[in-house]
């Protein structure tokens, strides 16, 4: 619980250190949204893969399939995995979102789809490995650098984002249950 509190405090603190118009953390009373920083990271990763699809060799062909898989995977994450993370500033401020039941539904779906999401990470890694093998023959060193970024992104999701979203759901279950008692 302590790391969760520290993480929430840091996010809240950082979000309030800028002028309001430069505040990149979505603070909302209603529907949760994927934090803009994570959404932007997804966009950047997809832009890199999109650039690789322009290669006129087998690495480009693998990149096309990788782009399709990543686009689908990121959409799933932005639909039900990452929106609860947008609630961290609200929860850190001691507030309970109005639509707690909806958010609990998202985190329950995450719990049921966790092995599927991790399997998709493995599928993405397999395509990345294939692209690395094919790119070696065509001298595309930028693919190796991209692989590091992509693996780090997946690691952060598996070690931080997925568990944090689940903790948010469990926290809301406890708070909404005690509110109704």
Write out the residue ranges for each language-model feature.
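Sec-dependent N-terminal signal peptides
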Residues: 4-12
């Amino acid at each position: 619980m302590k790391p969760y509190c520290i993480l929430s405090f840091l996010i809240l603190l950082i979000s309030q250190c800028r002028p309001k118009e430069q505040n990149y953390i979505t603070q909302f009373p209603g529907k949760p949204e994927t934090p803009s920083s994570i959404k932007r990271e997804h966009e950047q990763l997809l832009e890199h893969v999109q650039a690789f699809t322009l290669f006129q060799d087998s690495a480009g062909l693998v990149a096309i399939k990788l782009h399709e898989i990543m686009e689908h995977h990121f959409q799933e994450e932005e639909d039900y995995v990452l929106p609860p993370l947008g609630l961290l500033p609200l929860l850190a401020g001691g507030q309970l979102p109005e639509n707690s039941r909806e958010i609990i539904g998202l985190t329950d779906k995450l719990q049921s789809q966790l092995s599927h999401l991790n399997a998709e990470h493995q599928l993405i890694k397999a395509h990345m490995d294939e692209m690395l093998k094919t790119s070696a023959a065509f001298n595309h060193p930028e693919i190796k650098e991209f692989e590091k970024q992509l693996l780090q992104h997946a690691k952060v999701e598996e070690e931080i984002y997925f568990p944090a979203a689940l903790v948010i759901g469990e926290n809301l279950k406890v708070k909404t249950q005690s509110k109704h008692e």
